[in-house]
Amino acid sequence: MAGSIYGKLFTVTTWGESHGKGLGVVIDGCPAGIALSEEDIQIYLDRRKPGQNEFTTKRNESDKVSILSGIFEGKTTGTPISLVVMNEDQKSKDYGSIAESYRPGHADYCFDEKYGFRDYRGGGRSSGRETIGRVAAGAVAAKVLKELGITLTAYTRAIGTIKVADDAIDLNMVNQNPLYMPNNTCAADAAAYLNEMMEKKDSVGSIVECIITGVPAGVGEPVFDKLDAKLAQAVMSIGAVKAIEIGDGTAVVSSIGSDNNDNFYMDGDTVKKRTNHSGGTLGGMSDGSPILIRASFKPTPSIFQAQDTVTRAHEEIVMEIKGRHDPIIGPRAVVVVESMCAITVLDLLMQNATAKLDNLKRIYRS
């Protein structure tokens, strides 16, 4: 299966299936000398693991990570880092009824057409559990970025029609509610809405936003590896993401140039912008402002209602899905978005190191 490797210099290869023995990731290109422990990675994995509240699947997984290689005496060695998480609570029998039929909204049909064979247990590689490897790698990338003064903060911006207004965002509230919303009032309203949808055996869409601060100007590789293009690719590769916005996003359509342009000014010796409609990127490179990316997630396709579908033999049937499923994807995907952004920014920072001769001189003429 191609397409499981991401990155050029900081590379991430995820592996494993939802109902296999385990899942994991191999990270290559991580600099040596970074203090790293299983606890550092576990903090990230705990943010996405199931069964933490009423709005997540009841699948009972500890998602405990083990480091197999690449760490010695608590520090990265510069060699490939292998991380593994074992599956503990698979209930594959819940999926026996779909072995010969296609779930609406899922990738079952497409996998069958592509490979002529598929792991129907929980979706295999298309399951949300595939993101375990991404999050583990993101924890490592974030640790490196922290050494460079770069931080990432992601949160649930909207659930259904309930959206946190720009002037109501309080990042201190993100970890104070189970939906990771930056406003507790909106979180309470969203929780009530989710309970209503769950009673109707339905699911809800959401928006996850990520702010990246501390990235110096000039990071990103024109033309095809632009910063915003790579961020969009990374986040769009997360299952269920249907749209990406950078900065003002689609709102620029109704804007005019004189409003949309971010005027520059000098703050001492530093070039800054008075506004940030561009979302921290210009010409595919960072401009020194906070980078803002927004991802729209479709409603969870696994709903507990009767739905029309077809079998592998092309027979039309009515299906009722069983199993344990989230009524919403966004909140558990917050750390996944954050992780993919961290991986992307670190990879582009490494590529940027060779952009100027002065950079090489600082390294090799010290």
Language-model-derived ranges and their functions:
Residues 21-33, 129-150, 225, 229-233, ...:
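Alpha-helical support elements that line or immediately flank enzyme active sites
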Residues 45-104, 108:
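Glycine-rich, N-terminal phosphate-binding loop and its surrounding beta-alpha-beta segment
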Residues 1-59:
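N-terminal, positively charged regions that mediate nucleic acid binding
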Residues 15-21, 201-204, 208-316:
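Glycine-rich anion/phosphate-binding loop at the beta-strand->alpha-helix junction
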Residues 11-14, 119-130, 217-221, 276-281, ...:
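A short glycine/serine-rich beta->alpha loop
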Residues 99-124, 307-325:
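Short acidic, glycine/tyrosine-flanked loop/strand segments centered on an H-E-D-like triad
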